[in-house]
Protein backbone atom coordinates (compact mmCIF):
# COMPACT_ATOMS: atom_id res chain seq x y z
CA UNK A 1 0.00 0.00 0.00
CA UNK A 2 1.29 3.46 -0.92
CA UNK A 3 1.83 6.40 1.37
CA UNK A 4 -1.44 7.90 0.16
CA UNK A 5 -4.18 7.12 -2.32
CA UNK A 6 -5.05 10.52 -3.74
CA UNK A 7 -2.63 13.45 -3.49
CA UNK A 8 -2.93 17.10 -4.47
CA UNK A 9 0.48 18.40 -5.52
CA UNK A 10 1.43 22.09 -5.54
CA UNK A 11 2.73 22.40 -9.08
CA UNK A 12 4.86 25.06 -10.72
CA UNK A 13 5.94 23.34 -13.91
CA UNK A 14 9.56 23.33 -12.77
CA UNK A 15 11.95 20.42 -12.52
CA UNK A 16 11.26 19.37 -8.94
CA UNK A 17 7.46 19.51 -9.04
CA UNK A 18 7.37 17.80 -12.45
CA UNK A 19 9.56 14.95 -11.24
CA UNK A 20 7.36 14.64 -8.15
CA UNK A 21 4.51 13.32 -10.30
CA UNK A 22 6.12 10.08 -11.52
CA UNK A 23 8.08 9.76 -8.29
CA UNK A 24 4.94 9.78 -6.14
CA UNK A 25 3.37 7.12 -8.34
CA UNK A 26 6.39 4.93 -9.07
CA UNK A 27 8.27 5.08 -5.78
CA UNK A 28 5.57 5.78 -3.21
CA UNK A 29 2.61 3.96 -4.73
CA UNK A 30 0.25 6.93 -4.96
CA UNK A 31 -2.70 6.05 -7.19
CA UNK A 32 -3.86 9.53 -8.18
CA UNK A 33 -1.78 12.70 -8.40
CA UNK A 34 -3.82 15.85 -8.93
CA UNK A 35 -1.74 18.96 -9.57
CA UNK A 36 -2.66 22.52 -8.71
CA UNK A 37 -0.86 25.47 -10.30
CA UNK A 38 -1.49 28.99 -9.01
CA UNK A 39 -1.62 32.06 -11.20
CA UNK A 40 0.02 34.75 -9.10
CA UNK A 41 0.59 37.17 -11.93
CA UNK A 42 3.88 35.61 -12.98
CA UNK A 43 2.98 36.14 -16.63
CA UNK A 44 3.28 32.50 -17.66
CA UNK A 45 0.66 30.88 -19.81
CA UNK A 46 -0.91 28.35 -17.49
CA UNK A 47 -2.34 26.08 -20.16
CA UNK A 48 1.11 24.73 -21.16
CA UNK A 49 1.87 24.17 -17.48
CA UNK A 50 -1.43 22.34 -17.04
CA UNK A 51 -0.68 20.13 -20.04
CA UNK A 52 2.87 19.52 -18.85
CA UNK A 53 1.52 18.03 -15.61
CA UNK A 54 -0.75 15.70 -17.55
CA UNK A 55 2.13 14.63 -19.77
CA UNK A 56 4.15 13.85 -16.64
CA UNK A 57 1.42 11.51 -15.46
CA UNK A 58 -0.97 13.62 -13.40
CA UNK A 59 -4.49 12.23 -13.13
CA UNK A 60 -5.93 15.73 -13.20
CA UNK A 61 -4.31 19.14 -13.62
CA UNK A 62 -5.94 22.20 -12.10
CA UNK A 63 -5.05 25.87 -12.33
CA UNK A 64 -6.38 28.74 -10.27
CA UNK A 65 -6.31 32.51 -10.60
CA UNK A 66 -5.14 33.77 -7.21
CA UNK A 67 -3.85 37.18 -8.29
CA UNK A 68 -6.58 39.26 -6.64
CA UNK A 69 -6.42 37.63 -3.19
CA UNK A 70 -2.62 37.59 -3.43
CA UNK A 71 -2.48 41.35 -3.70
CA UNK A 72 -5.43 42.29 -1.48
CA UNK A 73 -5.00 39.75 1.33
CA UNK A 74 -1.23 39.29 1.37
CA UNK A 75 0.64 42.10 -0.42
CA UNK A 76 -1.37 44.99 1.00
CA UNK A 77 -1.01 43.83 4.62
CA UNK A 78 2.74 43.62 3.97
CA UNK A 79 2.73 47.21 2.72
CA UNK A 80 0.79 48.35 5.79
CA UNK A 81 3.36 46.54 7.94
CA UNK A 82 6.34 47.92 5.94
CA UNK A 83 7.50 44.31 5.89
CA UNK A 84 11.22 44.05 5.08
CA UNK A 85 12.95 40.87 6.21
CA UNK A 86 16.33 41.75 7.69
CA UNK A 87 15.57 45.34 6.75
CA UNK A 88 15.75 44.70 3.01
CA UNK A 89 13.71 41.89 1.46
CA UNK A 90 10.00 42.72 1.02
CA UNK A 91 8.88 39.06 1.13
CA UNK A 92 7.70 38.87 -2.48
CA UNK A 93 8.09 35.08 -2.60
CA UNK A 94 7.30 34.35 1.04
CA UNK A 95 3.93 36.10 0.81
CA UNK A 96 2.76 33.71 -1.91
CA UNK A 97 3.30 30.51 0.04
CA UNK A 98 0.50 30.74 2.64
CA UNK A 99 -1.98 31.57 -0.11
CA UNK A 100 -0.93 28.57 -2.19
CA UNK A 101 -1.07 26.37 0.92
CA UNK A 102 -4.56 27.62 1.73
CA UNK A 103 -5.83 26.84 -1.75
CA UNK A 104 -4.04 23.49 -1.74
CA UNK A 105 -5.96 22.49 1.37
CA UNK A 106 -9.23 23.69 -0.18
CA UNK A 107 -8.63 21.63 -3.33
CA UNK A 108 -7.73 18.58 -1.25
CA UNK A 109 -11.05 18.86 0.57
CA UNK A 110 -12.95 19.36 -2.68
CA UNK A 111 -11.52 16.27 -4.41
CA UNK A 112 -11.40 14.05 -1.34
CA UNK A 113 -7.62 13.70 -1.23
CA UNK A 114 -5.98 12.09 1.78
CA UNK A 115 -2.73 14.02 1.37
CA UNK A 116 -1.11 17.06 -0.21
CA UNK A 117 2.43 17.33 -1.53
CA UNK A 118 4.98 19.90 -2.60
CA UNK A 119 8.33 19.83 -4.37
CA UNK A 120 10.38 21.85 -1.90
CA UNK A 121 13.87 20.67 -1.05
CA UNK A 122 15.27 20.18 2.43
CA UNK A 123 17.50 23.27 2.37
CA UNK A 124 15.00 25.95 1.47
CA UNK A 125 12.51 28.13 3.30
CA UNK A 126 9.48 27.07 1.28
CA UNK A 127 9.30 23.60 2.82
CA UNK A 128 8.83 25.26 6.20
CA UNK A 129 6.24 27.69 4.88
CA UNK A 130 4.16 25.01 3.19
CA UNK A 131 4.37 22.43 5.97
CA UNK A 132 3.56 24.86 8.77
CA UNK A 133 0.78 26.61 6.86
CA UNK A 134 -0.89 23.31 5.98
CA UNK A 135 -0.55 22.09 9.56
CA UNK A 136 -2.16 25.33 10.75
CA UNK A 137 -5.12 24.97 8.40
CA UNK A 138 -5.58 21.19 8.26
CA UNK A 139 -3.64 19.34 10.96
CA UNK A 140 -5.32 16.09 9.90
CA UNK A 141 -3.98 16.25 6.35
CA UNK A 142 -0.80 14.35 5.47
CA UNK A 143 1.96 16.32 3.75
CA UNK A 144 4.20 14.38 1.37
CA UNK A 145 7.61 15.85 0.59
CA UNK A 146 9.33 13.72 -2.07
CA UNK A 147 12.00 16.27 -2.99
CA UNK A 148 13.06 16.44 0.64
CA UNK A 149 13.35 12.68 0.93
CA UNK A 150 14.55 11.36 -2.42
CA UNK A 151 18.16 12.38 -1.83
CA UNK A 152 18.84 13.27 -5.46
CA UNK A 153 21.07 16.12 -6.56
CA UNK A 154 19.66 18.60 -9.05
CA UNK A 155 21.47 16.78 -11.86
CA UNK A 156 20.07 13.43 -10.70
CA UNK A 157 16.58 14.93 -10.44
CA UNK A 158 16.80 16.13 -14.03
CA UNK A 159 18.04 12.69 -15.13
CA UNK A 160 15.13 11.00 -13.31
CA UNK A 161 12.69 13.22 -15.15
CA UNK A 162 14.33 12.47 -18.49
CA UNK A 163 13.54 8.79 -17.90
CA UNK A 164 9.89 9.79 -18.18
CA UNK A 165 10.36 12.02 -21.20
CA UNK A 166 10.69 15.35 -19.40
CA UNK A 167 12.93 17.90 -21.12
CA UNK A 168 15.22 19.91 -18.86
CA UNK A 169 14.55 23.67 -18.77
CA UNK A 170 18.00 24.30 -17.31
CA UNK A 171 21.06 24.59 -19.52
CA UNK A 172 24.70 25.40 -18.98
CA UNK A 173 23.94 28.83 -20.41
CA UNK A 174 21.08 29.47 -18.00
CA UNK A 175 21.69 27.57 -14.75
CA UNK A 176 19.54 29.78 -12.54
CA UNK A 177 16.57 28.88 -10.39
CA UNK A 178 13.93 31.59 -10.70
CA UNK A 179 10.67 32.07 -8.82
CA UNK A 180 8.35 34.84 -9.92
CA UNK A 181 4.97 36.39 -9.28
CA UNK A 182 3.37 39.80 -9.70
CA UNK A 183 5.32 41.21 -6.75
CA UNK A 184 8.74 40.22 -7.98
CA UNK A 185 11.34 37.67 -8.96
CA UNK A 186 13.86 35.72 -6.89
CA UNK A 187 16.96 34.36 -8.61
CA UNK A 188 19.46 31.92 -7.17
CA UNK A 189 21.76 28.96 -7.89
CA UNK A 190 24.40 28.50 -10.54
CA UNK A 191 27.23 31.07 -10.51
CA UNK A 192 25.26 33.20 -8.04
CA UNK A 193 26.15 30.77 -5.27
CA UNK A 194 29.52 32.54 -5.18
CA UNK A 195 28.76 35.77 -3.29
CA UNK A 196 31.58 37.54 -5.14
CA UNK A 197 30.10 36.88 -8.58
CA UNK A 198 28.10 39.86 -9.81
CA UNK A 199 24.68 38.94 -11.19
CA UNK A 200 24.67 39.22 -14.99
CA UNK A 201 22.14 41.49 -16.63
CA UNK A 202 20.40 38.49 -18.18
CA UNK A 203 18.90 37.43 -14.84
CA UNK A 204 16.81 40.60 -14.55
CA UNK A 205 13.46 41.09 -16.26
CA UNK A 206 11.39 43.60 -14.26
CA UNK A 207 13.99 46.34 -13.86
CA UNK A 208 16.31 48.14 -16.24
CA UNK A 209 20.02 48.44 -15.72
CA UNK A 210 20.80 51.93 -14.41
CA UNK A 211 22.73 52.78 -17.58
CA UNK A 212 19.61 51.96 -19.60
CA UNK A 213 17.22 54.10 -17.56
CA UNK A 214 15.90 57.52 -18.66
CA UNK A 215 18.26 60.44 -18.16
CA UNK A 216 15.39 62.62 -16.98
CA UNK A 217 13.88 62.11 -13.55
CA UNK A 218 10.17 61.38 -13.21
CA UNK A 219 8.03 62.63 -10.34
CA UNK A 220 5.04 60.59 -9.27
CA UNK A 221 2.44 60.80 -6.51
CA UNK A 222 1.06 57.82 -4.61
CA UNK A 223 -2.15 58.18 -2.62
CA UNK A 224 -3.00 56.04 0.40
CA UNK A 225 -6.24 55.42 2.25
CA UNK A 226 -6.19 53.47 5.48
CA UNK A 227 -2.58 52.53 4.76
CA UNK A 228 -3.45 50.97 1.39
CA UNK A 229 -2.22 52.46 -1.89
CA UNK A 230 -5.25 53.48 -3.96
CA UNK A 231 -4.02 55.85 -6.68
CA UNK A 232 -0.94 56.79 -8.67
CA UNK A 233 -0.66 60.27 -10.17
CA UNK A 234 -4.25 60.98 -9.25
CA UNK A 235 -5.65 57.94 -11.05
CA UNK A 236 -7.45 55.49 -8.82
CA UNK A 237 -6.59 51.89 -9.58
CA UNK A 238 -7.81 48.58 -8.26
CA UNK A 239 -5.10 46.74 -6.30
CA UNK A 240 -3.77 44.44 -9.02
CA UNK A 241 -3.55 47.24 -11.59
CA UNK A 242 -1.88 49.50 -9.05
CA UNK A 243 0.86 46.95 -8.39
CA UNK A 244 1.41 46.54 -12.13
CA UNK A 245 1.71 50.30 -12.57
CA UNK A 246 4.10 50.62 -9.63
CA UNK A 247 6.23 47.82 -11.10
CA UNK A 248 6.39 49.58 -14.46
CA UNK A 249 7.26 52.99 -13.03
CA UNK A 250 9.92 51.75 -10.63
CA UNK A 251 11.36 49.16 -13.00
CA UNK A 252 11.73 51.69 -15.82
CA UNK A 253 14.01 53.73 -13.57
CA UNK A 254 16.05 50.76 -12.35
CA UNK A 255 14.50 50.70 -8.88
CA UNK A 256 13.94 47.45 -7.00
CA UNK A 257 17.04 45.27 -7.34
CA UNK A 258 18.42 43.52 -4.27
CA UNK A 259 21.57 41.44 -3.90
CA UNK A 260 21.84 40.11 -0.36
CA UNK A 261 23.13 37.42 1.94
CA UNK A 262 20.06 36.13 3.71
CA UNK A 263 19.59 34.02 6.83
CA UNK A 264 17.28 31.14 5.99
CA UNK A 265 14.87 29.53 8.42
CA UNK A 266 16.88 26.29 8.38
CA UNK A 267 19.95 28.04 9.75
CA UNK A 268 22.13 28.55 6.69
CA UNK A 269 23.05 31.71 4.84
CA UNK A 270 22.14 32.01 1.18
CA UNK A 271 22.86 34.50 -1.55
CA UNK A 272 19.65 35.85 -3.06
CA UNK A 273 18.95 38.20 -5.95
CA UNK A 274 15.55 39.87 -5.94
CA UNK A 275 13.61 42.18 -8.21
CA UNK A 276 10.71 43.83 -6.41
CA UNK A 277 10.28 47.27 -7.98
CA UNK A 278 6.69 48.19 -7.18
CA UNK A 279 6.57 46.66 -3.72
CA UNK A 280 9.72 48.44 -2.53
CA UNK A 281 8.47 51.73 -3.98
CA UNK A 282 5.10 51.44 -2.23
CA UNK A 283 6.66 50.50 1.11
CA UNK A 284 9.00 53.49 0.93
CA UNK A 285 6.10 55.84 0.21
CA UNK A 286 3.98 54.26 2.94
CA UNK A 287 6.73 54.64 5.53
CA UNK A 288 7.01 58.32 4.66
CA UNK A 289 3.29 58.92 5.06
CA UNK A 290 3.33 57.18 8.44
CA UNK A 291 6.04 59.58 9.62
CA UNK A 292 3.54 62.37 8.98
CA UNK A 293 0.39 60.78 10.41
CA UNK A 294 1.38 58.51 13.32
CA UNK A 295 2.16 59.65 16.85
CA UNK A 296 5.81 59.27 17.83
CA UNK A 297 5.30 56.44 20.32
CA UNK A 298 3.03 54.53 17.94
CA UNK A 299 5.55 54.95 15.14
CA UNK A 300 8.46 53.71 17.25
CA UNK A 301 6.51 50.71 18.51
CA UNK A 302 5.29 49.87 15.03
CA UNK A 303 8.83 49.97 13.62
CA UNK A 304 9.87 47.38 16.21
CA UNK A 305 6.87 45.13 15.54
CA UNK A 306 7.31 45.43 11.78
CA UNK A 307 10.55 43.47 12.05
CA UNK A 308 8.80 40.73 14.01
CA UNK A 309 5.89 40.67 11.55
CA UNK A 310 8.34 40.25 8.65
CA UNK A 311 10.22 37.51 10.52
CA UNK A 312 7.01 35.58 11.16
CA UNK A 313 5.96 35.72 7.51
CA UNK A 314 9.43 34.75 6.31
CA UNK A 315 9.47 31.84 8.77
CA UNK A 316 6.15 30.43 7.56
CA UNK A 317 3.99 31.54 10.48
CA UNK A 318 1.40 33.52 8.52
CA UNK A 319 -1.49 31.64 10.14
CA UNK A 320 0.07 31.59 13.61
CA UNK A 321 -1.52 33.32 16.63
CA UNK A 322 1.25 35.90 17.08
CA UNK A 323 1.10 37.00 13.46
CA UNK A 324 -2.68 37.35 13.71
CA UNK A 325 -2.34 39.38 16.91
CA UNK A 326 0.19 41.67 15.24
CA UNK A 327 -2.24 42.09 12.34
CA UNK A 328 -4.68 43.64 14.78
CA UNK A 329 -2.10 46.17 15.90
CA UNK A 330 -1.04 46.98 12.34
CA UNK A 331 -4.63 47.45 11.18
CA UNK A 332 -5.44 49.77 14.08
CA UNK A 333 -2.47 52.01 13.31
CA UNK A 334 -3.56 52.46 9.70
CA UNK A 335 -6.88 54.20 10.33
CA UNK A 336 -5.31 57.66 9.96
CA UNK A 337 -2.66 56.81 7.35
CA UNK A 338 -4.33 58.80 4.60
CA UNK A 339 -2.61 61.15 2.20
CA UNK A 340 -0.24 61.57 -0.72
CA UNK A 341 3.51 61.05 -1.09
CA UNK A 342 5.51 62.49 -3.97
CA UNK A 343 8.67 60.73 -5.14
CA UNK A 344 11.32 61.45 -7.75
CA UNK A 345 12.43 58.37 -9.67
CA UNK A 346 15.86 58.56 -11.24
CA UNK A 347 18.74 56.19 -11.97
CA UNK A 348 17.90 53.46 -9.48
CA UNK A 349 16.72 55.77 -6.70
CA UNK A 350 13.33 56.82 -5.38
CA UNK A 351 13.61 60.07 -3.43
CA UNK A 352 10.71 61.46 -1.43
CA UNK A 353 10.15 65.11 -2.35
CA UNK A 354 6.84 65.76 -0.62
CA UNK A 355 4.12 64.38 1.58
CA UNK A 356 0.66 65.65 2.60
CA UNK A 357 -2.35 64.53 4.60
CA UNK A 358 -5.29 66.92 4.65
CA UNK A 359 -7.09 65.47 7.66
CA UNK A 360 -4.49 63.38 9.47
CA UNK A 361 -1.17 65.23 9.37
CA UNK A 362 0.40 65.67 12.80
CA UNK A 363 2.87 68.18 11.38
CA UNK A 364 1.63 71.59 12.58
CA UNK A 365 3.48 74.38 10.74
CA UNK A 366 2.76 76.94 13.46
CA UNK A 367 4.39 74.69 16.04
CA UNK A 368 7.40 73.76 13.90
CA UNK A 369 8.12 77.20 12.41
CA UNK A 370 10.96 79.46 13.54
CA UNK A 371 9.32 82.45 11.87
CA UNK A 372 6.93 85.08 13.15
CA UNK A 373 4.01 82.64 13.03
CA UNK A 374 5.67 80.47 15.69
CA UNK A 375 3.11 79.44 18.34
CA UNK A 376 5.34 77.11 20.35
CA UNK A 377 5.59 78.22 24.00
CA UNK A 378 9.35 78.53 24.42
CA UNK A 379 8.99 79.41 28.11
CA UNK A 380 7.51 75.97 28.81
CA UNK A 381 10.75 74.35 27.68
CA UNK A 382 12.70 75.30 30.81
CA UNK A 383 10.38 73.48 33.20
CA UNK A 384 10.10 70.50 30.86
CA UNK A 385 13.87 70.17 30.60
CA UNK A 386 14.25 70.35 34.39
CA UNK A 387 11.77 67.52 34.98
CA UNK A 388 13.01 65.49 32.00
CA UNK A 389 16.60 65.67 33.14
CA UNK A 390 15.90 65.22 36.86
CA UNK A 391 16.80 61.48 37.01
CA UNK A 392 20.11 62.20 35.30
CA UNK A 393 20.78 65.16 37.59
CA UNK A 394 20.11 63.07 40.70
CA UNK A 395 22.32 60.24 39.45
CA UNK A 396 25.15 62.65 38.67
CA UNK A 397 24.91 64.24 42.11
CA UNK A 398 25.34 60.81 43.68
CA UNK A 399 28.06 59.32 41.48
CA UNK A 400 30.10 62.17 39.97
CA UNK A 401 31.50 63.67 43.18
Curated annotation (Swiss-Prot):
Binding sites annotated in the UniProt record for L-citrulline: 89, 125, 129, 177, 186, 262, 274
Record flagged with keyword Ligase: yes
Residues that coordinate or bind L-aspartate: 121, 125-126
Reactions it catalyzes: L-citrulline + L-aspartate + ATP = 2-(N(omega)-L-arginino)succinate + AMP + diphosphate + H(+)
Keyword Nucleotide-binding: yes
Biological processes, Gene Ontology terms: argininosuccinate metabolic process; L-arginine biosynthetic process; urea cycle
InterPro entries: Arginosuc_syn_C, Arginosuc_syn_N, Arginosuc_synth, Arginosuc_synth_CS, Arginosuc_synth_type_1_subfam, AS_cat/multimer_dom_body, Rossmann-like_a/b/a_fold
GO molecular function, one term: ATP binding
Main location: cytoplasm
CDD domains listed in its UniProt record: ASS (cd01999)
Protein name: Argininosuccinate synthase
Native source organism of the sequence: Synechococcus sp. (strain CC9311)
Gene that specifies this protein: argG
Amino acid sequence: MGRATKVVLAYSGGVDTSVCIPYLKQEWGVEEVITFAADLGQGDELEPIRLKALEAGATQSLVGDLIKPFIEEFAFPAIRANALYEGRYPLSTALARPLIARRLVEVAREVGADAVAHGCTGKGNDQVRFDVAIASLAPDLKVLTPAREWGMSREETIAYGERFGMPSPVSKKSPYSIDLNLLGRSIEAGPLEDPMVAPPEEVFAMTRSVDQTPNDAEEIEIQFEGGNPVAINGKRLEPVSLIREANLLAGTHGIGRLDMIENRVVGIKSREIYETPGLLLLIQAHQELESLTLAADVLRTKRQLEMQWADLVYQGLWFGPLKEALDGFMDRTQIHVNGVVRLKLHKGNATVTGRASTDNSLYIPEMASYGSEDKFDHRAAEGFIYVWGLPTRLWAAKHRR
